């Protein structure tokens, strides 16, 4: 193993001028281009601020990139470009980077629309660095409520919390670390699992009014959902 590693290092040193030249060419080619990718989850029981954290993230992205990106949500975010109504929209080609915000994803995965969820979509989700890029955000009450195939594609997991109804914070974990944290019953061992980064903010009235969760609830009520037997069958197929 040591000899193979030495060989890799020697080849790297010999090829370094070419690598630097090509890397600089990539930087020049992509200068000023917005490219977003990754799948990130926001988790927390009702009232802990998971949808608020996701909305704050969207506000920050819109403030940073303006109209250079598209935003698509299923919970009537006021600054969205499109309404997210079916997974088929993820397979379309977009002329700008797309940020998808998927609130209460476990409910969507149990809808009849998801019954025809194709393997092609999983392939698409793993290739989100291609083209203009797709970044997918989602919320769920618990990590294990989310479809296991979708969990395996996640880049990061935000564990959300809110104090006094106004101060909201979230710690982002590596998915493998977060899975261990969720499965760990001993508090001292849970404390040893460290977050990669964090975010915190005050829930202003403006932020609270940037989406309409009640309208989303009405939309959810109009959907047809699979039975437990159908869900189990779908999971076996995937």
Where are these regions (language model features)?
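Hydrophobic anchor at the beta1->P-loop junction of P-loop NTPases
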Residues: 42
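The conserved Walker
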Residues: 46
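Hydrophobic positions on the alpha1 helix immediately C-terminal to the Walker A/P-loop
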Residues: 53
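Conserved P-loop NTPase motor module
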Residues: 156, 169-238
């Amino acid at each position: 193993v040591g000899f193979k590693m030495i060989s890799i290092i020697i080849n790297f040193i010999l090829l370094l001028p070419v690598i630097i030249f090509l890397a600089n060419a990539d930087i020049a080619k992509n200068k000023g281009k917005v490219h977003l990718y990754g799948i990130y989850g926001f988790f927390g029981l009702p009232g802990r601020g998971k949808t608020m954290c996701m909305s704050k993230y969207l506000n920050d992205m819109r403030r940073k990139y303006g109209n250079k990106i598209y935003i698509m949500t299923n919970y009537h975010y006021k600054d969205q470009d499109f309404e997210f109504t079916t997974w088929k929209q993820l397979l379309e080609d977009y002329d700008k980077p797309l940020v998808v915000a998927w609130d209460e994803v476990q409910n969507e995965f149990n809808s009849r629309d998801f019954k025809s969820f194709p393997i092609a979509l999983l392939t698409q989700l793993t290739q989100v660095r291609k083209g203009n890029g797709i970044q997918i955000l989602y919320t769920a009450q618990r990590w294990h409520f989310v479809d296991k195939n979708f969990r395996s594609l996640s880049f990061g997991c935000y564990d959300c919390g809110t104090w006094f109804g106004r101060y909201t914070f979230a710690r982002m974990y590596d998915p493998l670390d977060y899975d261990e944290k969720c499965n760990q019953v001993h508090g001292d061992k849970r404390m040893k699992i460290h977050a990669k980064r964090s975010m915190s903010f005050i829930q202003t009235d403006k932020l609270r009014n940037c989406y309409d969760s009640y309208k989303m609830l009405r939309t959810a009520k109009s959907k047809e959902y699979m039975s437990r037997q159908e869900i189990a069958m779908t999971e076996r197929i995937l």
